[in-house]
Amino acid sequence: MGNNCYNVVVIVLLLVGCEKVGAVQNSCDNCQPGTFCRKYNPVCKSCPPSTFSSIGGQPNCNICRVCAGYFRFKKFCSSTHNAECECIEGFHCLGPQCTRCEKDCRPGQELTKQGCKTCSLGTFNDQNGTGVCRPWTNCSLDGRSVLKTGTTEKDVVCGPPVVSFSPSTTISVTPEGGPGGHSLQVLTLFLALTSALLLALIFITLLFSVLKWIRKKFPHIFKQPFKKTTGAAQEEDACSCRCPQEEEGGGGGYEL
């Protein structure tokens, strides 16, 4: 009989204890985000400053993240959410929650998982930051020539459309009022001046070659007139020297 009474008392105490534990747990489960609850004091209390609790019923509140150094606040901490950080100007975030800051890539580079990487041949990036390398422009697709080769920082510069002089090719002329009219006029003028200069040089070269050939083939044409002129000049000098003697001789005869 005594043992039975003892067993009943133990069972009653266990039931009472379980009810109390369940009541404590149920009290903490009812706490809202931004609060914490301790088992020995099952009361929902607000998180203190610089702490937060995104889930209610936690025994402690979490410490808010501090954004300093290369970080700045993107979103300030509240009682229910942690602070969000971002990198300062000139840096970019690394990691899913911006755990590290890395300096922005320079023009001619792109950001990869390993950091900043120089653009490969045939690509460029003219942006200062997190831009990606883009392929050079293919000028030949538009029927244009490459005026300036591209670099890792700048794209290819395409020239005016290539003009074909094939009889079967139809040359399209852009009106003067169009965007390419001025460029086409300049190109036409340049080609005309170049052609005229080449023709003039060819003509002068041929002229000198012909004169040189004639002078070598017929040297008397250039030398004979000079000889005749020299001989005539000598005869005139001789005559001018003899004439006074004849006059003197005649004068002497009259005196006798």
Swiss-Prot record:
InterPro entries linked: TNFR/NGFR_Cys_rich_reg, TNFR_9, TNFRSF9_N
TNFR-Cys repeat intervals: 24-45, 46-85, 86-117, 118-159
GO biological process: one example: regulation of immature T cell proliferation in thymus
Keyword NAD: no
Source domain of life: Eukaryota
Residue ranges crossing the lipid bilayer per the database entry: 188-208
Compartment annotation: Cell membrane
Annotated glycan sites: N128, N138
CC per GO annotation: external side of plasma membrane
Residues making up the signal peptide according to the UniProt record: 1-23
Topological domains, Cytoplasmic: 209-256
Induction per the UniProt record: Up-regulated after cell treatment by PMA and ionomycin, suggesting that optimal expression requires both protein kinase C activation and increase in intracellular calcium.
Keyword set, alphabetical order: Cell membrane, Disulfide bond, Glycoprotein, Membrane, Receptor, Repeat, Signal, Transmembrane, Transmembrane helix
First-listed, main subcellular location of the protein, grouped into a coarse class: membrane
UniProt KW Transmembrane helix keyword: yes
Any one GO molecular function term: signaling receptor activity
The protein's role, per its UniProt record: Receptor for TNFSF9/4-1BBL. Conveys a signal that enhances CD8(+) T-cell survival, cytotoxicity, and mitochondrial activity, thereby promoting immunity against viruses and tumors.
Quaternary structure and interacting proteins, as annotated: Predominantly homodimeric, but may also exist as a monomer. Associates with p56-LCK. Interacts with TRAF1, TRAF2 and TRAF3.
Name of the protein: Tumor necrosis factor receptor superfamily member 9
Species assigned in the record: Mus musculus (Mouse)
